[in-house]
Amino acid sequence: MFKYDINIANYDTALWKAIELEAKRQEEHIELIASENYTSPRVMQAQGSILTNKYAEGYSGKRYYGGCVYVDQVETLAIDRAKALFECDYANVQPHSGSQANFAVYTALLKPGDTILGMNLAHGGHLTHGASVNFSGKMYNVISYGVNKNGYIDYEQLNKLATMHKPKMIIGGFSAYSRVVDWDIMRQVADSIKAFLFVDMAHIAGLVAAGVYPNPVPYADVVTTTTHKTLAGPRGGLILAQGGSKEMYKKLDSAVFPGAQGGPLMHVIAGKAIALKEAMEPEFKIYQHQVVKNAKTMVNVFLNRNFNVVSGGTDNHLFLLDLVDKNITGQEADAALSYTNITVNKNIIPNDPQSSFVTSGIRIGTPAITRRGFNETDAYQLANWICDVLENINNEVVLNATKKKVLNICASHPVYS
């Protein structure tokens, strides 16, 4: 028999020390990785609940195990909230990750060897949109579109490639693109060749939920997302669709279970349900608007200090700094900023002369700093500190002074007070 007062700290000191150190790091570092965020204590409570004990293969009302009456209620809540939030009539909340959600979409709608048209990873796409090292690049014939010289998606190129190669599926979505995607144009191109339009909105789901970024659901045949990132929930995935056939929805469900997964993670699905409810609150809309305001504020600082921002700006939560003209690699910038307790990620830029391990750019995102209370004034200060570091990456005086400023602002904006 277990007692609720047993804990990790008194049993596994090595593990608890690592957890405590990570908690300290999160409080004392400024998080600018665009795909990271801070989830709420309610979500963590759900994920740490007794729901982790229950196996529930199948779907609500159609389980392969008994004793699922209450976990059925949990999953139904998550499904209903996802449908309401994203204005769709189909939602699968079981994918363990965004990549697994994408895998399910591919296997439901495509056959191995089919042609897909996705955004080039080097131009802002994602591994699962056809990168050669990923399953999507190994299982399918991949054609890639990219951005033009101004850093915007080249829709003319996309249309030409679609007309030439007749892909079975066109993929929209990104991991490092800072502008609004024209879903309508993508729909028109897909219709012209009778292709599926699949949108991966993992990075922008929170913005979409708040009405800050155009919703791809009315345009796409199917949409996937992660539930962390801008949505600020637990790590996991969703599959969404509107106006599709029962046959397609059945294929999507079957592709998740039993096609790619076994038992769903009911404690994580509960976390998704809480996060989706939180995303319906007025405060969430205010938060998402602030995410974009902070990103735009930071971009303006970099431009004013003669840094090159890919596409010249941002319409969402992220942007890329092109450091070629500064003679700094992304790897060097990442390391220097890390020393000052500012966390970014090195990132390839369009036509990058460096390898993907070194890179010539860094990606910066504002969801996490906004979640802990940063406003435009804070974002303005932070961007200037980053400029100071990047202009003085070997100057310990500047680096140490910046680290002190970072610790002070983190103390005044705690993540979990």
Swiss-Prot record:
Its EC number is 2.1.2.1
Pathway(s) the chain acts in: One-carbon metabolism; tetrahydrofolate interconversion; Amino-acid biosynthesis; glycine biosynthesis; glycine from L-serine: step 1/1
**Keywords carried by this UniProt record:** Amino-acid biosynthesis, Cytoplasm, One-carbon metabolism, Pyridoxal phosphate, Transferase
Oligomeric form and interacting partners: Homodimer.
Main location group: cytoplasm
Q: Does the record carry Amino-acid biosynthesis as a key word?
A: yes
The reactions it catalyses are: (6R)-5,10-methylene-5,6,7,8-tetrahydrofolate + glycine + H2O = (6S)-5,6,7,8-tetrahydrofolate + L-serine
List cofactor names only.
pyridoxal 5'-phosphate
The UniProt entry's GO CC annotations, sorted and at most eight, read: cytosol
Provide the binding site for (6S)-5,6,7,8-tetrahydrofolate.
L121, G125, H126, L127, S355, S356, F357
Q: Which family does it belong to?
A: Belongs to the SHMT family.
- Superkingdom in the source lineage: Bacteria
What is the name attached to this protein's record?
Serine hydroxymethyltransferase
Where in the cell is the protein located? Cytoplasm
What GO biological process, any one, is recorded here? tetrahydrofolate interconversion
Task: Give a short account of what the protein does.
Answer: Catalyzes the reversible interconversion of serine and glycine with tetrahydrofolate (THF) serving as the one-carbon carrier. This reaction serves as the major source of one-carbon groups required for the biosynthesis of purines, thymidylate, methionine, and other important biomolecules. Also exhibits THF-independent aldolase activity toward beta-hydroxyamino acids, producing glycine and aldehydes, via a retro-aldol mechanism.
Checking Pfam families in the record gives: SHMT (PF00464)
Query: Which molecular-function annotation in GO is an example for this chain?
Result: pyridoxal phosphate binding
PTM N6-(pyridoxal phosphate)lysine: list the residues. Answer: K229
Annotated site residues (Plays an important role in substrate specificity) in this chain:
H228
